[in-house]
Design a protein with these regions (language model features):
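C-terminal helical cap(s) of enzyme catalytic domains, especially alpha/beta-barrels
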Residues: 278-293
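N-terminal pre-domain/capping segments
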Residues: 1-93, 187, 297-338, 357-362, ...
Length: 381
């Protein structure tokens, strides 16, 4: 099982704001990846920073990724499509410079195509051209790329097609899978918050995640997954905005449980889209560690049960049944105990005793400055 976690952008806690400084902080936190959000044209003042990030990623075995323009209209008019492709070209150039492993792109509104085969075919044709452009950039015969050693020895960035979070945008899970299935060099970017929102809050249990990843694996035959995760506020099947994970009905614990218990075959990159960025990335890492700890505890119990069964000649199933019965009895006992605990105390008698004790002479009262009586209110905590 391979799981890499990181934030979408420079960490909030980073004192500097450059990509390289962000990478340093991410590595110090024990995270292993990052998704750069800078998609501007590579100008002289940016080149040095991007190149340094690429060198660091190459030397530190750090997975660098990049996110393309958030606003794209690949299904729009010729002018809108041309404008979007120009922005994507800048992203592809930046991806080469920073040694990005994945390039995440959006498609945009359905436009005049509407839902259906025509829209999917148009998207597939556009992304085929984008994949070809990435290969052209990576294998430019006119330049040996002496400052980009990862280009000569590596493979081009993979184009990620992200699932959208709104009904009016192209990018349902089924649409993305269909296009990826037909365009080599592309992968689905599973934005869990978007899938959860479009499904009216569908991602609730570890079984839900099992069905999701099995569906993708069976559809396109991959074990490599690139995912975004965050909390999300959603209404009527549409994502409204991202939230921190703890303030959403989209919980990370079921995904952590699936990854640990049933996701041994996964090679997964998880990017935190949360407003808390690296803080929620660390929260996800902690939940995965907790799931691993629970798994170890369960296996230890099973080992002890098998050893005891061998010693006593009892079946493992019988021992497990007895443990469950004992646990049930303990639970029932804990529930019944509070009903038996409150017993009426003879408070009036105690008060009378106090009155009787207070009847001796005034001299006695003055001598007993410190009272060690068990009923002294000052001794009640």
């Amino acid at each position: 099982m391979g799981v890499k976690l990181g934030p979408a952008g420079v960490p909030l806690s980073c004192k500097g704001r450059t990509i390289v400084e962000g990478m340093d902080d991410i590595i110090a936190l024990g995270l292993e990846t990052m998704e750069a959000q800078t998609v501007r044209l590579i100008q002289p003042q940016h080149f040095e920073q991007y190149w340094q990030a690429g060198v660091l990623a190459n030397k530190a075995d750090f997975e660098m990724n990049i996110h393309g323009p958030y606003y794209s209209e690949l299904l729009g008019s010729r002018v809108e499509r041309g404008r979007s492709l120009a922005k994507i070209e800048a992203t592809l150039q930046a991806a080469r410079t920073i040694n990005a492993r994945h390039i995440t792109l959006h498609t945009g509104h359905y436009g005049d195509f509407g839902r259906g085969t025509a829209a999917n075919e148009q998207v597939a044709n556009i992304f085929s051209d984008i994949v070809q452009r990435v290969h052209d950039i990576w294998h430019d015969d006119e330049d040996d790329f002496p400052v980009f050693p990862w280009i000569k020895d590596g493979t081009p960035s993979k184009i990620g097609i992200e699932t959208s979070g709104r009904q009016e945008l192209w990018g349902s899970l089924e649409e993305v899978i269909e296009v990826v299935n037909h365009v080599e060099g592309t992968i689905p970017v599973l934005n869990i918050a978007h899938i959860h929102a479009r499904g009216h809050g569908r991602m609730k249990t570890s079984e839900d995640y099992g069905e999701l990843f099995d569906f993708v694996r069976e559809s396109i035959g991959t074990k490599e997954f690139y995912c975004h995760f965050s909390g999300v506020e959603h209404r009527t099947g549409n994502a409204m905005h991202y939230t921190q994970i703890k303030k959403s009905d989209l919980n990370f614990e079921p995904l952590a449980e699936f990854i640990v218990e049933d996701g041994g075959w996964l090679d997964i990159t998880l990017i935190s889209d949360s407003p808390l960025l690296e803080h929620d990335a660390m929260y996800m890492l902690q939940n995965i560690d907790k799931a691993k700890h629970k798994q170890l505890e369960r296996k230890a119990r099973e080992d002890r049960r098998r050893a005891l069964a061998a010693q006593t000649g009892t079946s493992v199933e019988d021992l497990q049944r007895r443990e469950e019965e004992m646990a049930k009895l303990r639970t029932q006992g804990d529930k019944e105990a509070p009903a038996e605990e409150p017993k009426p105390e003879p408070e009036p008698v105690k008060k009378e005793e106090k009155v009787k004790k207070a009847s001796p002479s005034k001299k006695k009262e003055e001598d007993d400055v410190f009272s060690f009586d068990e009923e002294d209110d000052d001794d009640l905590f």
